[in-house]
Amino acid sequence: MRTIQFREAICEAMSEEMRSDDSIYLMGEEVAEYNGAYKASKGMLDEFGPERVIDTPISELGFAGIAIGSTMTGNRPIVEYMTFNFSLVGTDQIINNAAKIRQMSGGQFKCPIVFRGPTASAGQLAATHSQAFENWFANTPGLKVIVPSNPYDAKGLLKSAIRDDDPVIFMESEQMYGDKGEVPDGEYTIPIGVADIKREGDDVTIVSFGKIIKEAFLAADKLAEDGISCEIIDLRTVRPMDHQIIFESVKKTNRLVILEEAWPFGNVATEITYQVQSRAFDYLDAPIEKINTADTPAPYSPVLLKEWLPNSEDVVKAVKKVLYK
């Protein structure tokens, strides 16, 4: 099987869907002439032209509204944010229009739109460019939220997101665009709302998603040296969440650690903790451990940033804590 970069998987997913459906178009800052800020739309302007690959002014509120309005006339837009930190400017359109059009119109209108771009930290980008918003959007009924961790999942899930008749938040990472992975040549999709067991184990369940899951794999390798077997679940979709796969894993391992790159208050890990303790409490042999960023804005200093972010050492400590070792 061929190996391609994450950015190439994103580009392939968009291009393949645009070839099969003329109602799909891409818009955002620098997506056309510059081939995308992270080259995720490389070559698409040449293939599809300026009417379907559209450079926008620096006005996230404006082009989000244009795209959402166009869904009501039969279009299926893909909106790229240079970073989801900038999506805050367009949040009124996403939360108050995209997420609510179907219900408020009594089902007369649907809103098939994908908002995609990088989320969370990416090195020394400081406080306003290092925030994770998946839990914010997942809190909103009407939105689906996807956070893939590798090229294969990214392509399959993005194709499903583009075909979905409801608004989808599709979150990537600047630090993943160069990641390589095996992706088949043929057509495939991955259903939204289905998590994946990336590594099977018997002693503890680790749940994570997005780029931070790499720290879980590093920790699992380290723990294996001590004879500790970790099962790693990649959520892939934050909303709708695949609770059942987590419950079944906890029934087997009896211990749960959740790793997430977000502030500790009211996040995805908190929701998982509630669901497991409500529906699988009798299978737990230890309190659930959750690992998040520090409860402060992201620092610029590389020394402080290293301490702010969760890492594999944090995961090792959490696993040993739930194992009472």
Regions found by a protein language model. Name each.
Residues M1-P167, M171, K306-E307, ...:
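Thiamine diphosphate
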